[in-house]
């Protein structure tokens, strides 16, 4: 019912990250179940609202669980996928997580692209800290885009630096309304 109300007032896309692989979800989220998440996504889609959904890399998931998450997004027919990378912050439940290495992240992006060849896949939170000088490789190795500016809990690079990177790669700048 709520999804239909959102559709009636003009909502065209709803964001609801699956966060991680279904098999890893109970270890990550304690406020709701994976079934609750699926209920929300299914209702939005049934109401005719497109769904944007992705997750966070670096939550102590296995490589197999990363692949599982990609196939889950494919099963759900998600065409807009943000991939965040955990930036361990002191005072949070994941403060002691070991940061992922840049090449591991880039390989993960390539696997997602292989599994989801037509999806809009982009990276957002944690990319500056985790990819460091290799951020541009993500755009040449599988991602369609990056989120620019600050994120929910941390700041990002300046938009000017990101635009310069895009220009240096000789890519076309396209603002996407999600």
PLM regions: where:
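A structural motif corresponding to the C-terminal end of an alpha-helix
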Residues: 40-51, 111-121
């Amino acid at each position: 019912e709520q999804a239909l109300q959102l559709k009636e007032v003009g909502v065209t896309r709803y964001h609801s990250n699956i966060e991680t692989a279904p098999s890893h979800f109970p270890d990550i989220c304690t406020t709701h179940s994976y079934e609750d998440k699926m209920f929300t996504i299914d209702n939005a889609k049934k109401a005719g609202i497109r769904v944007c959904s992705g997750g966070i890399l670096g939550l102590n998931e296995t490589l197999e669980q990363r692949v599982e998450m990609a196939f889950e997004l494919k099963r759900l027919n998600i065409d807009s996928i943000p991939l965040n990378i955990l930036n361990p912050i002191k005072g949070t439940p994941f403060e002691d997580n070991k940061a992922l290495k840049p090449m591991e992240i880039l390989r993960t992006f390539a696997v997602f692209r292989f599994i989801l060849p037509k999806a809009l896949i982009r990276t957002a939170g944690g990319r500056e800290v985790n990819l460091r000088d290799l951020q541009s490789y993500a755009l040449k190795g599988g991602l369609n885009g990056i989120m620019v500016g600050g994120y929910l809990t941390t700041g990002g690079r300046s938009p000017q630096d990101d635009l310069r990177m895009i220009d240096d790669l000789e890519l076309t700048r396209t603002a996407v309304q999600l």
